């Protein structure tokens, strides 16, 4: 074994080659010059260190297994020289073991040329790698003490600090460059996408504007065509163009209603008025000339006035009916007994005739006054209410013949009471009509409903009847 080692060393000296260490890796590293402390002036520092380490006599064969100990930073498990002696005591020195360890010296030639990966390994992490490349078994590494391990770690960290920093900077710069280039590429693609989106939006806006212009132009053409068609169709219907505009609503209206609406602007029937109003409202936006606008406004005003008149009559009727009912209720409760003598003084000649008839009634039937006042008031109120309804609401004028027939059927006492109460009620209603005529604007609807003239006619008829009855009584007395 010693001869084999000596032969290798002699060949290395002759060829100036050190096969016991990774010479190619260490020589290429830039930190090797700064990290080396023990180096002679000669260029072959490996052999000097090798001769120094091989000077130990008894353990020469074991020291040849690790001839790469030129400095402390090359091996992470390097400790004091005493530690190597302790390690070698436990290892078995045999020929096949030495041959396997010598074969391991050729393996570092395949390892990559960057030594930073080995320097960055943690303490104790290169145990399996050192077994393959450096030939130190796992059993021998466990013998190292903790103090020796810490000391070797501190030396390795001090020697390889600059090399590790430089290696980290060298490795981070290219990776950062790759990341920045990828980011720049993605940024450029995003900008291109945004530009494409903006161009699409502008194209769509231009397209919408073009479509709107086409729509307005076609709408104008359609309006002109409708006017032309209406001008061609007007002579067939014998109606002027200004009274009617061509529209789909107008097409749905029958020909009869169209001619009626064109010929008669305002119809009395309530069914044709809504049709005419709807036709005018639809054609109001499509007027041809200002004359049409004026005519349509006049028609609208006339229709509004007709609607007001239609609503004013029922309101007046309801108002009058309410007042009559209230008056009759007051009469039944004897609220206006104190005012019963006033109408007779104001009437003049009709009251004198009624007084004469009342005096004759007192002379002929003295027992009739013995009736209860409640029965007389109820009967008078009922008959006056019926007469008011007939005269005011229904507008029926009683003829003299019918009055004569009803007077013949009734008793003379009952007849005189009825005539007397009818005169009083008609006089009160006429006074109310005069008060409403002279009152505020709330009685305008009552003035439109002509009830006073009807009651005056009824009073004239009643006066003639009373005159005839007075003459009859005088003839009987004679």
From Swiss-Prot:
Subcellular location: Cytoplasm
Chain positions found as Phosphothreonine: 239
Disulfide cysteine pairs (residue numbers): none
Polar residues composition-biased segments: 260-290, 335-362, 371-380
Cross-referenced InterPro entries: Tda11
Coiled coil start-end: 182-219
Transmembrane segments: none
Biased composition (Basic and acidic residues): 293-304, 406-424
Annotated region (Disordered), positions in chain: 32-62, 255-309, 335-380, 403-478
Protein name as annotated: Topoisomerase I damage affected protein 11
Species per Swiss-Prot/TrEMBL record: Saccharomyces cerevisiae (strain FostersO)
């Amino acid at each position: 074994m010693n001869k084999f080692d000596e032969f290798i060393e002699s060949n290395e000296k002759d060829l100036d080659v050190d096969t016991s260490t990774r010479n190619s890796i260490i020589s290429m590293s830039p930190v090797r010059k700064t990290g080396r402390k023990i180096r002679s002036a000669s260029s072959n520092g490996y052999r000097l260190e090798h001769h120094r380490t091989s000077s130990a006599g008894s353990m020469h064969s074991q020291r040849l297994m690790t001839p790469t100990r030129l400095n402390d930073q090359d091996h992470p498990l390097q400790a004091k020289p005493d530690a190597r002696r302790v390690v070698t005591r436990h290892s078995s020195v045999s020929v096949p073991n030495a041959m396997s360890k010598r074969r391991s010296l050729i393996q570092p030639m395949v390892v990559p040329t960057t030594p930073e990966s080995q320097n960055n390994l943690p303490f104790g992490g290169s145990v399996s790698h050192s077994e393959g490349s450096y030939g130190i078994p796992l059993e021998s590494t466990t013998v190292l003490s903790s103090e020796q391990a810490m000391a070797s770690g501190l030396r390795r960290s001090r020697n390889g600090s600059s090399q590790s920093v430089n290696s980290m900077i060298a490795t981070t710069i290219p990776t950062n460059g790759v990341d920045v280039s990828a980011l720049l590429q993605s940024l450029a693609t995003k900008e291109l996408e945004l530009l494409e989106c903006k161009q699409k939006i502008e194209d769509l806006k231009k397209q919408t504007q073009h479509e709107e212009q086409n729509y307005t132009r076609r709408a104008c053409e359609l309006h002109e065509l409708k006017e032309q068609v209406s001008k061609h169709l007007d002579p067939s219907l014998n109606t002027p163009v200004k009274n009617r505009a061509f529209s789909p609503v107008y097409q749905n209206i029958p020909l009869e209603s169209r001619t009626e609406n064109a010929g008669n602007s305002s119809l009395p029937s309530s069914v044709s008025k809504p049709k005419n109003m709807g036709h005018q409202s639809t054609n109001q936006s499509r007027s041809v000339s200002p004359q049409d606008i004026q005519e349509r406004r006049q028609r609208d005003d006339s229709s509004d006035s007709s609607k007001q008149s239609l609503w004013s009559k029922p309101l007046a009727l309801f108002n009058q009916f309410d007042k009559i009912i209230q008056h009759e209720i007051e009469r039944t409760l004897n609220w206006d007994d104190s005012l019963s003598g006033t109408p007779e003084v104001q009437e003049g000649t009709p009251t004198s005739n009624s007084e004469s008839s009342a005096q004759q009634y007192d002379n002929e039937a003295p027992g009739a006054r013995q009736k209860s006042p409640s029965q007389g008031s109820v009967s008078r109120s009922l008959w006056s209410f019926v007469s008011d309804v007939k005269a005011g609401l229904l507008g029926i004028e009683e003829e003299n013949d019918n009055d004569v027939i009803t007077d013949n059927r009734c008793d003379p006492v009952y007849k005189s009471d009825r005539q007397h109460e009818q005169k009083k009620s008609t006089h009160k209603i006429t006074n109310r009509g005069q008060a409403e005529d002279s009152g505020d604007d709330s009685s305008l609807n009552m003035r439109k409903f002509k009830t006073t003239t009807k009651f005056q006619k009824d009073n004239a008829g009643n006066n003639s009847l009373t005159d005839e009855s007075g003459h009859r009584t005088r003839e009987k007395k004679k």
